[in-house]
Amino acid sequence: MKLKMLLLSSTPPGSPGGQTDPDTSSKTPTTTTAATDTSPRRQSINKQSQQTETKRRGYGRRPSSRTRRPQTHQRRSRSRSRSRSSSQTHSSTTTTTTTYRSRSTSLNKTRARSRSRSTSRSTSTTSRRGGRGSSTRQRSRSPSTYTSKRSREGNTRGRGRGRQGRAGSSGGREQRRRRRSFSTSPDSSKRVRRESPKYRGVSPSEVGKQLRSVGAKHSGRLGRLLEEARDPPVILVRGDANTLKCFRNRARNKYRGLFRSFSTTFSWVAGDSIERLGRSRMLISFSCLTQRRDFDDAVKYPKGVEWSYGSLDSL
């Protein structure tokens, strides 16, 4: 608009384009004055700015560089981003803590419920176990409670066992006492001692079973007497010396395994003289009575030969 006003004012009044209304011609000088007034003001403002610049240069101060402004902007942006991230992390931690707390409270509630249920059911089970003679046992009314019992057994075993063990400890202790009394009773210990071969007596049929003589063992008087009572069995054969020698040679080959050893022929002599008393004799030793019986059943003694059973303390 200012340019239009200047163009209108610069055209002369006698030119064809300059013929205008009287109202416009009267207004033109005011606009020119305004335009002329604005130009010296701008010049004065520019001069003042130049003077301030020269004054600053005189003191030796320099204007701040433009590179520091974006750094402040970057710092502000970083601080804003940090504040945002910290606020976000704080909010996330608060949310996670709230979720953990809610879960822990729910778990505690469920545990408390399971404890109360396990205690009530453990008391019922102990009351059922207390009566062993009772044939009828109550069962759960609904299948849902039966399945829930099985699912909760794993959680309530460790806690329910303590109270069940306290309630049923008296029965278990009584059973243990009965077992201990049965195992450590004097009758059972006597039976075991009676059955042991060390404390057995020697029956008449067992006399003569042992082959070797009793050595110098530190088994005591009783053990020594019992060992001496078991003497090896023997058969004493009486007859002519030649017949006994022939019988011995045949029996060694024919009846192997049915005897232990044969002795040479001998004869008894009286104490006052050197004369032989009776016929010559021979001993046949055995390891046990059964062996002697088997030998006696299998052997055929020659004519004119007599025999008799006996036992010796040692051979």
UniProtKB/Swiss-Prot annotation:
It holds the Pfam family PPV_E2_C. The keyword Cytoplasm does not apply. Its main location: host cell. One of its GO terms (cellular component) is host cell nucleus. GO terms for molecular function: DNA binding; DNA-binding transcription factor activity. It is found in: Host nucleus. This is Protein E8^E2C. The lineage of its organism: Viruses, Monodnaviria, Shotokuvirae, Cossaviricota, Papovaviricetes.
